[in-house]
Amino acid sequence: MRKYKGYKEHLIEKLRDSEYASAYLNACLENSFETKNMGIFQLAVRDVVEAHGGMTEISSKMEVSRESFYRSLSQKGKARFSTLVNAIKACGLELEFHPA
């Protein structure tokens, strides 16, 4: 019998590609602004972190405790913008702004 991947597993696999991860983060950030819900972007960053080594590896690169990093990216967490940017950088990506 053929095994199928779940949505999350498939997403994490796709997010290992930096181009895909960049497009995903851009789309989620745009959606966050449109809906005034920054939680969307925060969870997108969490997905990218999971795809690029997980909480332990990325928090180590950021030189922060895994526990506080995990809490800040949880659904109930309120991550600072600087935390999100540092996590993105630790995943080998960067945040850019362009004229509208």
Give residue spans per PLM region.
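Short, charged recognition helix plus adjacent turn
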Residues: 3, 96-100
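DNA major-groove recognition helix of helix-turn-helix/homeodomain DNA-binding modules
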Residues: 81-97
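Key DNA-contacting residues within the recognition helix of helix-turn-helix
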Residues: 70-71, 85
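Residue-level detection of the helix-turn-helix DNA-binding "recognition helix"
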Residues: 74-75
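Amphipathic alpha-helical interface surfaces
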Residues: 21, 37, 41-45, 54, ...
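N-terminal flexible/basic segments that precede or flank functional cores
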Residues: 1-44
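Short alpha-helical DNA-recognition segment
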Residues: 47-70
